[in-house]
Amino acid sequence: MLLTLRRWLLGGGTPPATTDVATPSDAAPLTLESTGIDAPLDFAAILSATPDWPVPDWQQVQAWALSAPDPGLQGHAWSLAEKAWLAHMRLALGPHYRLTQHEQSLLLSCLEPNVADATVRFMTKTLARIERVLDGVAQPSPWGSDILIVFQDPETYYRYAARYYADDGEFALSSGMHIHFGCSHFIVQQDDLRLIEPVIAHEMTHGCLAHLAIPAWLNEGLAVNTEQRLRPPVASVHTPHELDGMHRRFWTEALIQEFWSGHSFLRPDEGNLLSYDLARMLTARMALDWERFRDFVLSADLADAGQSAARQSLGVDLGALVCALFDFGPAERWRPDPGRWDHEPERGAFQRTFLTQSPGLHRVPCGETTTCGLK
């Protein structure tokens, strides 16, 4: 991984230096003061008493930051709170974790210093590339930093993720998640460093789409295609022929409504992998004409899974697109039908719940992404 990151980032010139954010045992702040805000924030008082993980009341943090007189000072106050929270997280995780910063990217990990340095630089570079690939669609958050927490082991990773996951039992395995609750951040596992690069690209794409109320399938389709555009996938665990057969056997007129509503992405079975792959294929096909596709993305509404926007901007029926992929039909039985959805639709990068990725997600073959309209 380190060689790849260095090759991406250090190919020309000397990059800006990274910074180790000092976090000795007594450095987790209990009170925050910021320019332009009269009253300090009692940070200790708003930290939750949740076992294991210190999490502040982010609504109170936001109210405090908004009391600053201008947007620049508001963003500065929010950034102070982010670093304060990560300092408390570092203490909770243990002294082997360290906080590293490069421009607006923050990394909390126990990676070796040179790997942490390359990773945080990769985050900064990736953000710029996402903005170019998703021209006119991507919009980085105006507040705060891009935050990545790399957990040393799967047990700690899932124990942390469980705090944000609905108490509904089994959930899909994952390599990384975008936690879009309170302070938006990304989490990944350290076990397989080869997976960190695509996970960073995937999750940072979600962060750049957070301003759009788009359906989950489009959110995930954009993230997977952008990930593969920036970091080509490794060998697939399934051949294209095998995947095609899996799709044809799995999807039914009833299950496709789970896909359109976003709930199939939360399945713990093969439906999770197939949902990401179907989203990838649909997005790649629709993005061939970027100008029209961009209009579609900006107007797509999760309430109808983007059906109306697809007709208006692209002149296509979503049900017909699925039928064309797998020889299903008739199209009207496969298009989004919100009246048949059992739950409220999901946006993707799941708010309050989280993005789930099957172990095979990052090994899905690139397929049409080499010819899709992603720039």
Regions found by a protein language model. Give the residues of each.
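N-terminal low-structure segments adjacent to metalloprotease catalytic domains
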Residues: 1-100, 326-375
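Intrinsic-disorder-associated interaction segments
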Residues: 32, 36-39, 47-54, 71, ...
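Short, charge-rich amphipathic segments
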Residues: 45-68, 128-130, 158-159, 210-217, ...
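Charge-dense, low-complexity intrinsically disordered segments
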Residues: 72-76, 110-117, 273
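Short hydrophobic/aromatic segments of transmembrane alpha-helices and their interfaces
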Residues: 81, 89-91, 188-189, 206-207, ...
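Juxtacatalytic substrate-recognition/specificity segment
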Residues: 94-215, 305-313
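Acidic/His/Gly-enriched intrinsically disordered linker/tail segments
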Residues: 167-184, 195, 213-366
